[in-house]
Structure formats: structure tokens, C-alpha cells
């Protein structure tokens, strides 16, 4: 059975992607901050879902990913779907720093961990979901434009 891990699977696009993969018969690892939402997903497909509470802003998030990989017996696809975006008309630094902690530091932390896992395994796929605001820019939320940090990783290959 193929295995996908989705970080940010408790709502939105991440949740819908998890449902699609479950429907296609994959083993799905779901992760996010809200334990009660993770449990609902697990109960919706007994035996097909593994859960792990992961907050990508925490330094121990890669260790939590390792725990989820172990529970699942491996990982074939990694999808990062966690992200936040808030209107910030006053350009309050705290709002931008919170966004950067999730969307930039969280990206670096989690994609790095997945990449090194796949490097050891010799294969695997990494996908990242972002916002259109990242490509167009949004004056009231400048940190959303930081998705471009992922561009250089698109062409990395594990041989």
C-alpha cells in the first residue's frame, strides 16, 4: 500500500487531499496542531489513517514527523499543506513574524526532514501547497510572498 503524509491535514486543502488519497486506498498519515480534528479523520477510515500532532513552528517538529513515519512503516509521498495568512493592514511585525514562522521556518524544517528521509530511502516525492498570494504579492500581508523560497528545491533529485 502506498503511503502519504500530509502536514496541515486538519482543514482546507490538506483535509480534502487526505480524503482523496483515502478514497484511492492509500495509507494516509495526517498531522496538524488540532488533536480533536486528527482523531475525527482517523475515525473516518479505521486502519487506513495514522495521526501525529505536529506544530511546524516548533523545533521538535521533524522528530514528530519521524514518529509518524515509523507508525506508518515508511513514507512514499510528503505533502506540506500547513500555512497561515492574515491581513495585516498596519504591517504589525508580530503578525508577519508569526506567518514567517509557519510558512518559512516551518517549510524549511519539514521539507528538510522529508528530503533527508527520502535521500536515505533512495526515492520519494515532496509536494508543497501554497497561496496565490505568494505569486502575486499582497501588500497587506508581505510574508505570504515568501513561498518563492521553495523554488530552488523543485529540481532536486535523489538518485
Where are these regions (language model features)?
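Short alpha-helical oligomerization interface
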Residues: 89-101
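Conserved glycine-rich Rossmann-like NAD(P)H-binding loop of the short-chain dehydrogenase/reductase
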Residues: 24-39
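Single conserved hydrophobic/aromatic residue that forms the stacking wall/gate
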Residues: 147-159
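Rossmann-fold cofactor-recognition segment
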Residues: 45-60
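Conserved glycine-rich cofactor-binding loop
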Residues: 10-11
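Conserved NAD(P)H cofactor-binding loop of Rossmann-fold oxidoreductase domains
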Residues: 81-86
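Residue(s) in the substrate-gating loop at a strand-loop-helix junction
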Residues: 131
